[in-house]
Amino acid sequence: FILWFCLFGFNGGSTVAMEGTTVAAGGVGEITMGALAGSVFSTTNLCAAIATIVAMMFTWIKYKKPDVSMSLNGTLAGLVMVTASTDCIDMYGAAIEGIIAGIAVVLVIELIDKVCKVDDPVGAVGVHFANGFLGTICVGLFSTGQNGVGAGLFYGGGFKQLGIQLLGVVTVCAWVGITMI
């Protein structure tokens, strides 16, 4: 829960200001920072909360009992996923991302442990890699087109922003793959 609280500073602090106005790009006009910070706090909290509940319900259905550890990994997964898009999505996008994160973390942790036979005692791959990857792609799906980010596929932006996000994750994966050899 400490990490959940700290992500308000991490994500919210990225807005640079919590109140007042700042000069817009190019020195023309002003923009209100309070509304952006409030949106960032709301989407961060909603995604994490929904991911926690979905991970708990998913494990309860799958294993016939709730799994506290997996539920808390769901919290972290939601926080990781929403970090990429928290300033450019609405509450609906945050809710959908939370659902995706809650299911993805359980499935990827199980895949790594049982299929790949890799010892990942804290589920770091499922929490950070899988949900970071998916969260970056979700920008291209759920972005509302605000704050300098193009609109996502489901918000009338077509495939442009999705293509940019996919190029980004492929480039990072290639870079990591090459440098880890």
Question: What residues fall within each predicted segment?
Answer:
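Glycine- and aromatic-enriched membrane alpha-helices
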Residues: F1-I181
